[in-house]
Amino acid sequence: MNFNTSLVIMLLNLKMSVDRRNWLKHGCNLRLVILVLWLVCYVSNGQTIGDTSDFNNPAVLPLVTQMVYRSLSNSTAALNRELGIRAKFCVKDPDADWNRAFNFSSNLNFLSSCIKKTQGSIGKRICTAAEMKFYFNGFFNKTNNPGYLKPNVNCNLTSWVSGCEPGWGCSVDPTEQVDLQNSKDFPERRRNCMPCCEGFFCPRGLTCMIPCPLGAHCPLATLNKTTSLCEPYTYQLPSGRPNHTCGGANVWADIRSSGEVFCSAGSYCPTTTQKVPCDSGHYCRMGSTSEKPCFKLTSCNPNTANQNMHAFGIMVIAAVSTILLIIYNCSDQILTTRERRQAKSREAAVKKARAHHRWKAAREAAKKHVSGIRAQITRTFSGKRANQDGDTNKMLGRGDSSEIDEAIDMSTCSSPASSSAAQSSYENEDHAAAGSNGRASLGIEGKRVKGQTLAKIKKTQSQIFKYAYDRIEKEKAMEQENKNLTFSGIVKMATNSETRKRHLMELSFKDLTLTLKSNGKQVLRCVTGSMKPGRITAVMGPSGAGKTSLLSALAGKAVGCKLSGLILINGKQESIHSYKKIIGFVPQDDVVHGNLTVEENLWFHAKCRLPADLSKADKVLVVERIIDSLGLQAVRSSLVGTVEKRGISGGQRKRVNVGLEMVMEPSVLFLDEPTSGLDSASSQLLLRALRHEALEGVNICMVVHQPSYTLFKTFNDLVLLAKGGLTVYHGSVNKVEEYFSGLGIHVPDRINPPDYYIDVLEGVVISMGNSGIGYKELPQRWMLHKGYSVPLDMRNNSAAGLETNPDLGTNSPDNAEQTFARELWRDVKSNFRLRRDKIRHNFLKSRDLSHRRTPSTWLQYKYFLGRIAKQRMREAQLQATDYLILLLAGACLGSLIKASDESFGAPGYIYTIIAVSLLCKIAALRSFSLDKLHYWRESASGMSSSACFLAKDTIDIFNILVKPLVYLSMFYFFTNPRSTFFDNYIVLVCLVYCVTGIAYALAIFLQPSTAQLFSVLLPVVLTLVATQPKNSELIRIIADLSYPKWALEAFVIGNAQKYYGVWMITRCGSLMKSGYDINKWSLCIMILLLVGLTTRGVAFVGMLILQKK
């Protein structure tokens, strides 16, 4: 700064401080002004003042101090520009950080004291920008000890003056000009050495003074004769210099190397020369420049370094627990109230519908009775006698038919609920809807009302239930009247506009052969026949006969097999997958959601698989009809249950399993042993429901095992298979005994025919009369009976053809090794082909020929969302356990691991990453590992996989947001780091999102036990790799690919940003050692989210590839 600039600034300061009148009043004259300007000029240019008394003048010293401070600020600003590039990784805002460290404008007393002490030569003793740069550049060299500097022009092996010792400094020659902003050259500074001023530090190896940063305490040292140390610092007096005394501070570095310079914990340092104990009700961390008030509900004694925030942690967890309890209880209460109201409406509708049909039956009976009496009286008695009989009828309360009709109609209209319900199935009945608002009545006669459709009339829940149960009761009445009704009669009866037509499908197959690709074994061979709509076809045979294989081949689910022959649909060669929306497949295992009720399971499939344009009233009718026909009314509101939690009985569960496919109104229904494990009554109830479906035109094919005679006679057709997948019989059930009798196979008395035929095919029954036909010849007999071509090997020697084994060769070691290698290679190839076929099958696209438009993906996402939300609500105890474990983990880690200022809390964050990753991964595995079978079944039926995946991920967002809050409620308030709660919460949310995606992938690609093992192993291994020194390129690459590295960096950066002032070197040193960049906090967050999103994509692709349809 030149003289003219100094003059202008001085005049402005004088103008601002006092006005002209005060100047004259205090007797200031021209001589004082000239003296002040001269002093400022010399001090600012690094000159000394000969007369010390001039600096004791109160009017001169503040002005000179301001000028020195401006020069010092300019030099530190120049140093900031020089070091800003190298320190970019640890300084986010250079100006702000430098201002927090060297902005002494609030109190310049230490400068004034130093001006007095140095007799005005302070400008010649302060380090230039080049010397400061020389000192600070040493910290970027990892091998350099901050206590020692390299030799330089002033301190070297040939020149080591007293100012080179720690805590001392020297001045330049009095005639030499010093430019503090010079960042290139060292001035020769070896004269007039003296102890360092308070508020400055003089490093060993430099002869100049550097101002201590804010947050430091740099008093003059005093000699401790016991330890020979210059306290509070750690340097000793040099040997051989008896006149040398303790000086000032000697170093400013990281907390490990220069902890004595930092303002001690429990105190704060408003200036670098003043330390004040912390008052009661306040706390002061190490390196503080001011005391901070403690929060309410916390107690802070004097000299407190940190406040106890355990109470806030308890309050947070109490608030979170309260909110969760409110959410769960309110949701459960809402669901319970809704279900209770629906149950009341349903029960009322059932009572009214049954009462109405009882009245209708009574009316019909009365009509027939009156008609019979009239006819009898007319034939036997006179008119007078007939009049007497009429009086008798009146006495009995029965009038003529018109009076009865009027009475019944009036009783029907007397109920407000029944008067407003839309009754579309009544025949030749008029219902008047008389409301309180005086609307005109509507006459409904099984057709649309003029100006209004049924969909518009059926609005309320009561009306919908009444509509459904009136239809159900009418169907029951019709079934009772037409017990022997045939399929053609049903078709004729279904011509009214109320009945929806189902797509009729006939399946026919010719020379159907199924061969395993792995070993070439034929599981089906030359199977020919057909399955017609409106009929129930039973597939029977001994074990290994290929019953399930036939069902899978017809349903298009045979994977890993080579299929030959023809499968025709309605006489056309089309893919069965084109009709998957109207084909139901009931697996042998009861794949039903155990944490849903019976009604909820059925309703979910109805919503997702019934036509999208079907009205709600018709959907209610479908579901209620299935519940009623399967006898599930008593348990409709009961949870199905799981292995761990008991629910409904096994027979009821089996019926629910069948109802999931019946509720979508299929055209073809395949069932794999639906009666296994059921008693006779349950089996009959199930077959009665299937019989009703068949009467509506459904083509039903089912595998059964040893049915009773009653169930056997319920079937329309029978497919009997022998071992090896050969057909023994395919035709009507009523003609099976006739056919086998023609072969000389007669069923003994009191023996169930299907059991006897199975024993014959198993070879258990040896004697079969005088026919001389062996059980192995029965398939060939059936082919000859139907006129099919018999394969050559069967014609020659059927049994030998089935039992011939390939030559295994000799037992020589060479052949054995070649055989083993050949078998191993064959197994590898077969496994590869099987996986390829599964992937190809999963991604098979077929033209939709079902003519059914199911709900869109977005609508199915909504249904999945509601179902999964209910399941999570019913897993409240399990969720509470997860939260409790996280709570305990946060409390334990927060209590055992204290936040360290030296490492910015890195050890605690390392254990946090391991604990939270491990616990959240294991919990997230349940989202996909527990219901793989359910997903495979739903996906095979045509439900959207993306809707299922997105719904589960959406519901898990609740845990992703809540679990970090639960953990931090203990960990954060126990450790009380300098970073904010919000910063820690954001990082932890992103971490949980990341590990949840990884858990999805593990759950889908691995078995549950293996997935749990990897969930424990991955966080530990990846965290250890991420915290290892990056000495090799491989370790660095692996660390960059592991999510713990980015989570830990985000945690440390968030905490390091709150350390400034005296902590600047510590912050830069720690970040440089770890390889972190303070500007990459957002990048770390984005990478965690990207990993979570990528792993979710991988999990979704795996879900599509690995699904078993």
From Swiss-Prot:
How does this chain sit within the bilayer?
A: Multi-pass membrane protein
- ABC transmembrane type-2 domain location is 859-1059
The UniProt transmembrane annotation reads 877-897, 904-924, 954-974, 986-1006, 1007-1027, 1085-1105
Entries under InterPro entries matching the protein: AAA+_ATPase, ABC_transporter-like_ATP-bd, ABC_transporter-like_CS, ABCG_dom, ABCG_transporters, P-loop_NTPase
Report the locations given in the UniProt record: Membrane
Question: Does the keyword field hold Transmembrane helix?
Answer: yes
* Region feature (Disordered): 378-399, 411-439
For this chain, the family text in UniProt reads:
Belongs to the ABC transporter superfamily. ABCG family. Eye pigment precursor importer (TC 3.A.1.204) subfamily.
Task: Supply the PANTHER family for this chain.
Answer: ABC TRANSPORTER G FAMILY MEMBER 24, ABC TRANSPORTER G FAMILY MEMBER 28
In Swiss-Prot or TrEMBL terms, this protein is called: ABC transporter G family member 24
Q: Organism, per UniProt?
A: Arabidopsis thaliana
